[in-house]
């Protein structure tokens, strides 16, 4: 839970989503392979391999999604109208996610790492077929999460630590019919985020519960879109405390 209703957490008023990712222990071998195919030559390949023991689970997910995204259209900007084919809108995403859970008597240790690499080409504007440009974007990230939960009959405490690293690249170049560059825009943006959370929940009396949380965020971004001599890598440190009592009168 990285956010929830405000009566039990410091989540947003606009609404948040809690994702349940509870693993099943003592299930033995984990093996799942899938292949999909769709329109515009779209392919999806997915593989999950792992093992589930009595108090230990380890698995790795790997995937690859790609599509050509080519399609025909009628270009009304030419005289006479022409049936043409739009190209260079392809994309590919691939990544892997190792996961591990270890269960002790009254505690649970969890580790998850989601790593993805993406490349997407952007086509020329459809009516302007003679515009010579090359345009694409890359988005790579690594999101890592470590959690230790200790629980007792009337409550629990959880310590969570995460590290998010992301790199976004945008490239746009226009060139002449001879292949000589005219303009170029190459943007590189990076972000690094550390997040540490201590979360406590304790039953008090009947339906009454105590919720408390301490959270520290350390964030750093850098971008080639700004002058490095005037704007260094911006940093932000946020320390937040939260406590609430919830129950029925």
Question: How would you name each of these model-derived features?
Answer:
Residues 1-28:
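A beta-strand signature from Gram-negative outer-membrane beta-barrel systems
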Residues 13-15, 29-31, 43-47, 94-98, ...:
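Hydrophobic, lipid-facing positions within transmembrane beta-strands of outer-membrane proteins
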Residues 16, 55-59, 73-74:
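Residues embedded in well-ordered regular secondary structure
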Residues 21, 50-53, 102-104, 149-152, ...:
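Residue-level signature of outer-membrane beta-barrel architecture
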Residues 29-33, 58-60, 109-111, 157-161, ...:
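Transmembrane beta-strands of outer-membrane beta-barrel proteins
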Residues 35-39, 53-55, 64-68, 104-106, ...:
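Transmembrane beta-strands of outer-membrane beta-barrel pores
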Residues 67-73, 83, 87-93, 107-157, ...:
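Flexible loop and strand-edge segments within Gram-negative outer membrane beta-barrel domains
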Residues 137, 163-167, 175-249:
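Outer-membrane beta-barrel transmembrane domain signature of Gram-negative proteins
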């Amino acid at each position: 839970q990285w956010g929830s209703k405000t009566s039990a957490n410091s989540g947003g008023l606009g609404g948040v989503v809690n994702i349940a990712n509870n693993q099943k222990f003592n299930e033995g071998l984990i093996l799942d392979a899938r292949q999909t195919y769709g329109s515009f030559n779209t392919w999806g390949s997915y593989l999950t391999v792992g093992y589930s023991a009595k108090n230990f689970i380890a698995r790795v997910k790997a995937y690859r999604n790609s599509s050509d995204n080519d399609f025909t259209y009628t270009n009304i900007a030419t005289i006479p109208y022409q049936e043409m084919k739009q190209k260079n809108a392809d994309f590919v995403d691939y990544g892997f996610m190792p996961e591990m859970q270890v269960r002790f008597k009254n505690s649970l240790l969890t580790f998850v790492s989601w790593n993805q690499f993406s490349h997407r080409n952007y086509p020329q504007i459809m009516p302007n077929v003679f515009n010579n440009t090359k345009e694409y974007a890359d988005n790579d990230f690594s999101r890592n999460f470590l959690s230790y939960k200790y629980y007792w009959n009337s409550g629990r405490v959880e310590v969570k630590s995460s590290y998010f690293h992301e790199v976004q690249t945008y490239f746009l170049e226009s060139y002449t019919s001879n292949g000589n560059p005219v303009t170029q825009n190459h943007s590189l943006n990076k972000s690094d985020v550390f997040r540490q959370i201590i979360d406590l929940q304790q039953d008090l009396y009947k339906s009454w519960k105590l919720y408390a949380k301490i959270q520290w965020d350390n964030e750093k971004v850098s971008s080639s879109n700004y002058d490095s001599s005037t704007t260094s890598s911006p940093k932000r440190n946020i320390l937040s405390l939260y406590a609430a009592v919830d129950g029925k009168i």
